[in-house]
Design a protein with these regions (language model features):
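Conserved N-proximal alpha/beta basic substrate-recognition cap immediately N-terminal to
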Residues: 2, 7-100
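Short, well-ordered alpha-helical microsegments
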Residues: 14-15, 56-59, 110, 142, ...
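A short beta-strand motif that forms the metal-chelation/ATP-contact edge
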Residues: 45-49, 123, 169-171, 229-244
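Short glycine-rich anion-binding loops that position phosphate/pyrophosphate groups of nucleotides
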Residues: 53-55, 126-127, 239
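Hydrophobic alpha-helical segments and helix pairs
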Residues: 81-130
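A short linear hydrophobic-aromatic micro-motif
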Residues: 100, 119-122, 154-157, 218-221
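Phosphate-binding site of ATP-dependent enzymes
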Residues: 131-214
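A long amphipathic alpha-helix within ATP-dependent nucleotide-binding catalytic cores
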Residues: 186-233, 237, 247-266
């Protein structure tokens, strides 16, 4: 079978390991997403893995889908994870334990709102590399951010007291991987990542449910354990790096082969 990787970085550890597993019996092609839909011309893989989130990458994914090729994750599912306002609306509407989220057209408008309770988590509305994710303990923090981020559309979430560790849940197909990462919002000295982690009862099923709600096959779910012990989802990411998780490349290779085989049978 023939697999396609949509990525500017085929040497990424997850992709490189997956490609190595497939290369013995299958062809693996790399499509750089910079060319957008034009890169779909002549493309003939049985399945494509979308490890990019730029507008050009999504344009390429949509072009491949129009041609009948399966893309993991789909362009639509990937886009759902880029708008944090829509993400929260979808998750809360489906009954997922997602952090309550407010939207502001700009950080400057947030600064003018009089009804904020502190501390507050402020994030860029559009999820992307090097976006804004910060905990603020009062209005002074907003003023410090204004020169760089004043025009940035943002969302806010109330800061939920927690241990300072993010539970990272990664899903590939029906397999759930997990680890602990020191929260970027935590105070105090940085600590090394922990993992793998034994998840509390019900958390693995919660992660799989997120995939069904968002239409995702390869994704990450950021969860914090509230003081009462219950899970609170604070972010969902399409096709994260899943670094250092034993078995993740094998799970991704198996998923790609299943999707490719299903596509061939459907022709």
């Amino acid at each position: 079978m023939r697999m396609g990787l949509i990525t500017p970085d085929p040497a990424h550890p997850l992709l490189a390991a997956t490609a190595a597993l497939l290369a013995g019996r299958h062809e693996v092609d790399v499509l750089h997403p910079a060319a957008g839909a034009a890169a779909a011309a002549g493309a003939s893989a049985d399945v494509y893995l979308l490890k990019a989130r730029t507008p050009a990458a999504l344009e390429l994914a949509r072009a491949l889908e129009r041609g009948g090729a399966p893309v993991v994750n789909s362009a639509a599912a990937t886009e759902r994870c880029q708008d944090r306002t829509g993400m929260a609306e979808l998750a809360l509407g489906a009954g997922l334990p997602f952090a309550a989220t407010r939207t502001f057209a700009s950080l400057a408008l947030l600064a003018s709102a009089a009804d904020q309770e502190w501390p507050l988590v402020v994030k860029s509305r559009r999820s992307r590399k090097d976006d804004l994710v910060v905990r603020l303990d009062g209005p002074d923090g907003l003023r410090e951010l204004a020169p760089r981020w004043g025009a940035e559309p943002v969302v806010t979430q109330a800061f939920a007291p927690n241990s300072g560790w993010d539970h990272k849940l990664w899903v590939v197909g029906d397999q759930v991987f997990a680890g602990l990462r020191r929260s970027e919002l935590a105070t105090g000295a940085a600590e090394s990542p922990r993992g793998p982690e034994r998840l509390p009862d019900g958390w693995a099923e919660l992660a799989l449910r997120v995939g069904r709600v968002f239409g995702l096959d390869v994704y990450g779910v950021d969860v914090i354990a509230e003081d009462g012990g219950g899970p609170l989802i604070v972010d969902v990411n399409a096709f994260p790096g899943i670094r250092g998780q034993a078995g993740a490349p094998e799970a991704l290779a198996a998923l790609a082969l299943r999707r490719a085989a299903a596509a061939r049978q459907g022709r």
